[in-house]
UniProtKB/Swiss-Prot annotation:
It comes from Acidithiobacillus ferrooxidans (Thiobacillus ferrooxidans). This is RuBisCO operon transcriptional regulator. Pfam families: HTH_1, LysR_substrate. The keyword Transcription applies. Keywords: Activator, DNA-binding, Transcription, Transcription regulation.
Length: 309
């Protein structure tokens, strides 16, 4: 056989297995039985003339040929998707999907913005994935989505990152915390105050730790959580203070559960970024959504509504 005889179906199957590094998970995603999936991968390997995976114990690994084919598959499938979208655009159609992956912190405004976009473009089927930074970076590396919303673009990846909204970080405490009565608090004053933080690798935590380290302060971490809600509940319960995006605490400020501390150097001025792999040809739908993000954030109607620290 020759690689020219490989089918698009086989390439899609191989790409799924390479993405998950698991035949079982790929079969589940594609709604195929594992035996049927294995047959297609074996036939593709025969067409290539090289094994695509090595199996060591229960784990599989890409061979050199598999690595090369993975890169080719991404290019082929991306080009095909882009072609499909271009044809739809030329025909004046708004069909197909828009896949957006965003941080859990943005759940306070990105769904609202996506809803506004869908109202203007009812023919676009949108898929929203919400996760933490580590998961989003994994998805970005695999090019699983059309667009990624991040508070801090990855420095180790070749990406395009366009800022579309402010994302100030503030120090937050329970309303009756003694420090809420003070002004212009020196960062060093917080050296012995217990902090409730997001999980290691979180963009918010990275920014907070970097700031305090620059001021000679190593944060005293009492607890860490993978969600803003858990962090806020712990702070409201008096277990410590935290650093969060201002967009996440509007309700708690209004209800009197939490307060922003006046710490020197805060708020930390950050941005929200629309991110995609460099070299990727973004679809007309992705481009339209990015334009909507910029416009909505500029006029403040659907963008992140931020409290004043």
């Amino acid at each position: 056989m020759s690689i020219r005889h490989a089918t698009l179906h086989q390439l899609k199957i191989f790409a799924a297995v390479a993405r998950h590094m698991s035949f079982a998970r790929a079969a589940e995603e594609l709604h195929l039985t594992p035996p049927a999936l294995s047959i297609q991968v074996r036939q593709l390997a025969e067409a290539v003339g090289q094994p695509l995976f090595d199996q060591i114990g229960k784990k599989i690994y890409l061979t050199a040929a598999g690595e090369a084919l993975t890169s080719a598959c991404h290019d082929i499938l991306d080009r095909l998707e882009y072609f499909t979208q271009e044809i739809a655009a030329l025909q004046g159609l708004e069909k197909g999907s828009l896949k957006v992956a965003t941080l859990s912190t943005t759940k306070y405004f990105i769904p609202r913005m996506l809803g506004g976009f869908c109202t203007e473009h009812p023919g676009v089927a949108t898929v929203l994935f919400i996760g933490n930074r580590e998961v989003l970076l994994e998805r970005l590396a695999r090019n699983q989505d059309d667009l990624y919303i991040l508070g801090q673009p990855p420095e180790h990846m070749n990406v395009v990152a366009e800022a579309f909204a402010d994302n100030p970080l503030v120090v937050v405490a329970r309303l009756d915390h003694p420090l809420t009565q003070e002004k212009d608090i020196e960062p060093s004053r917080l050296r012995d105050v217990p902090f409730i933080l997001r999980e290691p690798g979180s963009g918010t935590r990275l920014a907070a730790e970097k700031f305090f380290e620059q001021h000679g302060v190593i944060l005293k971490t009492r607890m860490e959580f993978g969600s803003n809600e858990a962090v806020k509940q712990s702070v409201a319960g008096g277990l410590g203070i935290t650093v969060l995006s201002a967009s996440t605490i509007r309700a708690e400020l209004a209800s009197g559960k939490l307060a922003i501390l006046d710490v020197r150097g805060f708020p930390l001025e950050r941005k929200w970024y629309a991110v995609y792999p460099a070299g990727k040809r973004i679809s007309p739908r992705t481009k339209a959504f990015m334009e909507y993000l910029f416009a909505a954030s500029a006029d403040g109607e659907n963008g992140p509504s931020l409290p004043k620290p």
